[in-house]
Design a protein with these regions (language model features):
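Alpha-helical membrane-targeting segments
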Residues: 1-27, 228-254, 328-341
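Conserved alpha-helical substructure of the radical SAM core
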Residues: 3-131, 331
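Flexible mid-to-C-terminal extensions adjoining Fe-S/redox cofactors in radical SAM and related proteins
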Residues: 27, 259, 276-341
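Soluble, non-transmembrane catalytic domains of enzymes that act on hydrophobic metabolites at membranes
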Residues: 30-55, 59-61, 75-79, 172-180, ...
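Cys/His-rich zinc-coordinating "finger/knuckle" motifs
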Residues: 46, 50-54, 269, 287, ...
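Residue-level signal for well-ordered alpha-helical positions
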Residues: 46-49, 121, 148-151, 292, ...
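Short, flexible loop/turn elements at secondary-structure junctions
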Residues: 82, 110-112, 140, 176-178, ...
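Radical SAM enzyme [4Fe-4S]-AdoMet core and its adjacent flexible, acidic
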Residues: 128-278, 282-288, 292
Length: 341
């Protein structure tokens, strides 16, 4: 990630902190968009692939929904389902780069089942002079990963995509979802765990569309093992290191306590495939971009009521790395304390 991008993200977070101290309500600077429920994986911890996509957001609806907030957006995260299955991807990137003058990062999460297409998507973003970040979902060694993801040969396609991205110097990393299914792999691994630079753990509902049976004792121990081997190679890795440390404390508190305040709806919003706009994937919709634009929804009574709930810690409590970096940056002192505590 380029230095000017890092400085821009630091700037917008400082600006948000100052505005909040003045009791002002800045617009979110990050939008996460789940473009589709369509998915070609068959993950054992997620049932989204069983959903038959219907009434999903269109490029036209996205275009209309951004009216009035274009200059507030610094960071876009695209996911699914599987992003590489979205037909209007190039049109979307053109729209974002042409209209959001402060846009610095476009992030994609992918299962890598179509490595050539995903690589072309990533290269297209890079050619727009925007920092891209591609997270390649990888949950273990070949046997473990392909079993979890339900598709034979998926592991090798992850390796193909990573090699192509590395050769073109496109920012990317392996991201692991910790569960009881890859517990044995994690606990029997050592330095190999250093390759994982994005770390989350299984949840229920939200984009998982499934109630997962809790195996938090195993997940907690696996997270500790990953933290022990985590290597900070780049400046942005510090955020992930803090994320993992707080995730461990979150799990130690049985997922019932936010270790630092959640900042969703202030720094970020989440748009679902059906157009529902949410603070995060686990909370109620505050509006729908098929019916109203983002700015109008942000100005609504329901948004302000939901912000109060979040401020008072009345949220589902998830500590997912979709949202945690922004909570960390909006609570720098408490986050640094957690880093050394």
């Amino acid at each position: 990630m380029r230095l000017k991008t890092i400085l821009s993200i630091i700037y917008i977070n400082l600006k948000h902190n100052i505005l909040k101290l003045q009791n002002k309500n800045p617009n979110p600077y990050k939008i996460l968009i789940n473009l589709t429920d369509l998915c070609n994986s068959r993950c054992n911890f997620c049932d989204i692939w069983k959903i038959k996509p219907k009434n999903e957001i269109t490029m036209s609806e996205i275009r209309k929904s951004f009216k009035g907030i274009e200059n507030d957006i610094y960071w876009i995260a695209l996911s699914g389902g599987e992003v590489s299955l979205v037909k209007y991807f190039y049109e979307l990137i053109d729209f974002l780069t042409q209209n959001c003058k402060n846009l610095k990062i476009i992030a994609i999460t992918t299962n890598s089942l179509t490595p050539n297409r995903t690589f072309e998507f990533a290269r297209y973003i890079k050619n727009k002079n925007i920092d891209s970040h591609i997270t390649i979902s990888l949950d273990g060694d070949e046997k473990t990963h392909d079993k979890i993801r339900g598709v034979s040969g998926n592991f090798k396609k992850c390796e193909i995509l990573k090699k192509k991205l590395d050769e073109q110097k496109i920012n990317n990393c392996y991201g692991i979802t910790v569960s009881d299914a890859n517990y044995d792999y994690i606990m029997s691994s050592g330095n190999e765990l250093k390759k994982f630079k994005a770390v989350t753990f299984v949840h229920s509902e939200g984009i998982y569309a499934k109630e997962n049976i809790s195996a938090d004792e195993k997940i907690l121990n696996a997270m500790k093992k990953i933290l022990y081997h985590f290597k900070i190679d780049k400046l942005q890795d510090i955020l992930e290191y803090i994320h993992i440390k707080i995730a461990i404390k979150f799990l130690e508190h049985k997922r019932k306590k936010n270790i630092i305040k959640c900042d969703v709806l202030n720094s970020s919003i989440h748009i679902m495939p059906n157009g529902d706009m949410k603070p995060c994937m686990f909370m109620e919709s505050i509006g729908n971009i098929k019916l109203e634009n983002i700015q109008k929804i942000l100005n609504s009574k329901k948004t302000f009521e939901t912000k109060k709930l979040i401020k008072n810690d009345n949220c589902p409590k998830c500590w997912m790395n979709c949202y945690s970096p922004h909570s960390i940056m909006q609570n720098p002192i408490k986050s640094i304390y957690q880093l050394f505590n």
